[in-house]
Amino acid sequence: MKLSALYQIFLDCQSVTTDSRNCPDGSLFIALKGESFNGNAFAKLALDSGCAFAIIDEIQYAVEDDQRYILVDDCLQTMQQLANYHRRQLGTRVIGITGTNGKTTTKELISSVLCQAHNVLYTLGNLNNHIGVPTTLLRLKPEHDLAVIEMGANHPGEIKFLCEIAEPDYGIITNVGKAHLEGFGSFEGVIKTKGELYDFLRKKDAITFIHHDNPYLMNISQGLNLISYGTEDDLYVNGRITGNSPYLAFEWKAGKDGELHQVCTQLIGEYNFPNALAAITIGRFFGVETKKIDKALAEYTPQNNRSQLKKTENNTLIIDAYNANPTSMMAALQNFRNMTVPHKMLILGDMRELGADSPAEHQKIVDYIKESNFEKVWLVGEQFAASEHSFKTYANVQEVIKDLQEDKPKGYTILIKGSNGIKLSSTVEFL
């Protein structure tokens, strides 16, 4: 079937699902495959549950003479092509966002600001891979005038591929840091892969929003059409931090002589300052009133274990347990060290996907903790356990929870950070 004909079926269906447990009436089911499942096997169930059509790539799962089955060579590839075709047909302005740290928070901040004046489609959660990006694009409607598309990667070439699907008209890289070194091979590999967004934008002479204070980004920005933000006075948007205990507060202005704005956020961490400036920059570029920009930033509440502050009966928790890498871990520790709060405690989990660099990177974190004045330090995971230190260590989060059930700390401000696979977020209910 030609893509144009398949697109007409998609338009008639209005929505797409890849989950046979979630089949809105009249939707289009796409049979994707995973390590432990084959979506083709659930095509009949999807049709029985209300889907109007099912795209499959294994003919044996089709029911003879049932025209609702659409056979293609590769379901995932078809989904990606369909998403790109849909994006082109609508012509919605697309902002592409990637980076090592903060891309999901920045995407949320940008979307919160833009929604003050525009009808915006944006990536839900962190659906930012080869499946998540087309899934988001297929949600585009004619009424959307902007789309904010998050793009993630853990191997070279992935951002280039996602750019070919989303075809961003504007772009931003939040930062580059030491993450997924196992897949990228080196920090230079991270920079090169994230820079694939710049390569795409450069060819289109598209607008690129850039953090002017970041030397790694500036070094690869040659030939780009730049709009800059940072701390220097003459930038499109510039500002400085005014508070950080515990919430981030800052002031900003547009250009050298712009009106000074004060913003108090509900975000934890000085590392979120550039993310907020990025949202202001993009909001200003797309014509959002400054009062509405400030309001959106002040009212944004972080979710999903990212820079969240939670007060329990016993302690104050800074929950940043969605993910961790050497760059984000060090930034979180430096921020926590600078906070003027009493009785600081750390519960840190291993940083995963670092490959051969893992022992050295964990040791660097441990050495920094040794130099700092934290009252209690608990380290979770085999990499931290193998480092040279005398801090309390746990093999896994279950051991931590067992200790907490017997004798929980009280009166502490506790930073909780580690790779998502360590599952440190499960300690929260016991603190």
Task: Show the residue positions of the predicted features.
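N-terminal leader/targeting and accessory segments in enzymes
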Residues: 1-81, 85, 338-339, 367-381, ...
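Acidic, Mg2+-coordinating active-site environments of NTP-dependent enzymes
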Residues: 3, 60-65, 172-316, 341-342, ...
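Residue-level signal for inorganic ion chemistry
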Residues: 27, 46, 82, 97, ...
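Active-site beta-alpha connecting loops in nucleotide-dependent enzymes
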Residues: 34-37, 302-305, 322-391, 419
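Phosphate-binding loop of NTP-binding sites
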Residues: 78-212, 216-224, 283, 402, ...
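Peripheral docking tails and interdomain loops at the edges
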Residues: 393, 412-429
